[in-house]
């Protein structure tokens, strides 16, 4: 399917980043921040051709003069005008395609409200005139990307984390759990604990620097208390990081204290269970007969699962919670940052999937509610 003329488009809209590309490719062609920026002040330069809004990287680079908004909060679209701008930017500026010539596969958060799926469907057919479209649940696509149809996915991105048990390709809605703790919270927490060390990061520009520190230097400790002791008694865990202005900062126990919040949300002042317990609780909400398959197929997905050491720690924590004879396997594919998109690329290029698309004709006959009958 390298034939871009008929290739389906796959668009994974996350709270933090939008991933887009062509079905059949092994990675997204475009990855950009899910932000829309509007000028704070009237243009000073007359005739500068000032745009009334900027999307993605351009909004990010001009953030000094813009008000930035994220149209997707905790995985769910909350601002449709801005969302439309992001899709427009995706098709015309990033992929440089005419959406009316390609089927479009969109992704949605687990437990996405029904009205939202209908609105996505309506915008695709009425605003972008797509010939066909489909809406797939993000975690299910991640599971497909790992070559499975049964398992439990811990999907953790920038705005939200979910544990989604899936049996024979179907997500089990009664057992899906959501945790409002994800990448953005960890970045904020790292800003806070670096401030305690005497480094001050406050602006949105500095937040991006901290996000980079987090992605490059943080890791999950197998045993938190032991790691804290090691960090206190030696400098073996210290790493240095050069800021854009050339100043070098040193970071020690912050490296593993930051992602530890995933396992101990109390660090962030949250009362919820950690990701290990949430995964276990999700499994326990499932039928007793399928739990064995879920324990043995626990798949990590999303950018916030990219910390070194996270799979070993999950293995250790879930082993402590599960029955002692249970076989537990944590699958952490190296490409898991993009596994939702990759799963979409695989799905949309399957010959057996071609009958699953919602066509323009079906939409015209049934209206937006067709999405509930065809996408589940």
UniProtKB/Swiss-Prot annotation:
Record-level Gene Ontology MF annotations: ATP binding; hydrolase activity
Modification Methionine sulfoxide, positions: 45, 48
UniProt entry tagged with the keyword Signal: no
Residue positions assigned to the propeptide: 1-2
Post-translational modification: Oxidation of Met-45 to form methionine sulfoxide promotes actin filament depolymerization. Methionine sulfoxide is produced stereospecifically, but it is not known whether the (S)-S-oxide or the (R)-S-oxide is produced.
Keywords: Acetylation, ATP-binding, Cytoplasm, Cytoskeleton, Hydrolase, Nucleotide-binding, Oxidation
A Pfam short name: Actin
CDD domains: ASKHA_NBD_actin (cd10224)
PROSITE patterns: ACTINS_1, ACTINS_2, ACTINS_ACT_LIKE
Keyword Acetylation: yes
Family: Belongs to the actin family.
Function of the molecule: Actins are highly conserved proteins that are involved in various types of cell motility and are ubiquitously expressed in all eukaryotic cells.
PANTHER family registered for this protein in UniProt: ACTIN
Protein name stated in the entry: Actin-3
Organism this protein belongs to: Limulus polyphemus
